[in-house]
Curated annotation (Swiss-Prot):
One GO cellular component term noted in the UniProt record for this chain: ribonucleoprotein complex
Organism: Synechococcus sp. (strain CC9902)
Underlying gene: rpmE
Family named by the database record: Belongs to the bacterial ribosomal protein bL31 family. Type A subfamily.
Top-rank taxon, per record: Bacteria
Name of the protein this chain belongs to: Large ribosomal subunit protein bL31
Keyword set, alphabetical order: Ribonucleoprotein, Ribosomal protein, RNA-binding, rRNA-binding
A Pfam family of this chain: Ribosomal_L31
Keyword flag Lipid metabolism: no
Biological-process GO terms, alphabetical: translation
Length: 79
């Protein structure tokens, strides 16, 4: 015989709350879900995403680990 009352209570209209405002409803095991970020205010979904300049990071990595450009190595070899 299966055990009774082992499953959590299901709330079909659980409120998702972001910054004190109900942003959507969904099914969950808690009546209220508090979130910091959701698709309505996430930069990726709102189109306000910033493009990061990774060239500086690559240059910093190359400098840190001594992997300079090949141009500098050729110049040193010809001297």
């Amino acid at each position: 015989m299966p055990k009774s009352d082992i499953h959590p209570t299901w709330y079909p209209d659980a409120k998702v709350i972001c910054n004190g405002e109900v942003v959507m409803t969904t099914g969950a095991t808690q009546p209220e879900i508090h979130v910091d970020v959701w698709s309505g205010n996430h930069p990726f979904f709102t189109g306000t995403q910033k493009i990061l300049d990774t060239e500086g990071r690559v240059d910093r990595f190359m400098k840190k680990y001594g992997m300079g450009s090949t141009k500098g190595k050729d110049d040193d070899a010809s001297s």
